[in-house]
From Swiss-Prot:
Matches recorded under CDD domains: Ribosomal_S12
GO molecular function: rRNA binding; structural constituent of ribosome; tRNA binding
Name listed for the protein in its UniProt record: Small ribosomal subunit protein uS12
Record function comment: With S4 and S5 plays an important role in translational accuracy. Interacts with and stabilizes bases of the 16S rRNA that are involved in tRNA selection in the A site and with the mRNA backbone. Located at the interface of the 30S and 50S subunits, it traverses the body of the 30S subunit contacting proteins on the other side and probably holding the rRNA structure together. The combined cluster of proteins S8, S12 and S17 appears to hold together the shoulder and platform of the 30S subunit.
Biased composition (Basic residues): 109-124
NCBIfam families listed in its UniProt record: rpsL_bact (TIGR00981)
3-methylthioaspartic acid: residues carrying this PTM: 89
Length: 124
């Protein structure tokens, strides 16, 4: 236990928490331009072709971000909005592309969980 004099001379250090999404620069989302759209394979127990895009952000970073949902309309030079949120089985993918914002279309024929995929309410 530190004495009062020791604490007066040098106060207790605050632990600094490292950001999990540094490219967002403490913003909820960031805009960027796709530089490459491609598929990649996940880590070991899983098997798939995951759709990802390399995005150059307005903050100056170039990050890899995941394109969720079935099917997408992204290509090089598409303007996208990205949010934080990693993909556990894709190393280095720490961001998600927001569906239904800017140049990204929503998922077609989506009935449940529509708000997460930028889909409008279907005409009943």
């Amino acid at each position: 236990m530190a004495t009062i004099n020791q604490l007066v001379n040098s106060p207790r250090k605050r632990s600094v928490v490292k950001s999990k999404v540094p490219a967002l620069k403490a913003c909820p989302q960031r805009r960027g331009v796709c530089t490459r759209v491609y598929t990649t394979t996940p880590k070991k127990p899983n098997s798939a072709l995951r759709k990802v895009a390399r995005v150059r952000l307005t903050s100056g970073f170039e990050v890899t971000s995941y394109i969720g949902g079935e099917g997408h309309n992204l290509q090089e030079h598409s303007v996208v909005l990205i949010r934080g949120g990693r993909v556990k089985d894709l190393p280095g993918v720490r961001y998600h592309i927001v569906r239904g914002a800017l140049d990204t279309s929503g998922v077609n024929n989506r009935k449940h969980g529509r708000s997460k995929y930028g889909t409008k309410r279907p005409k009943s």
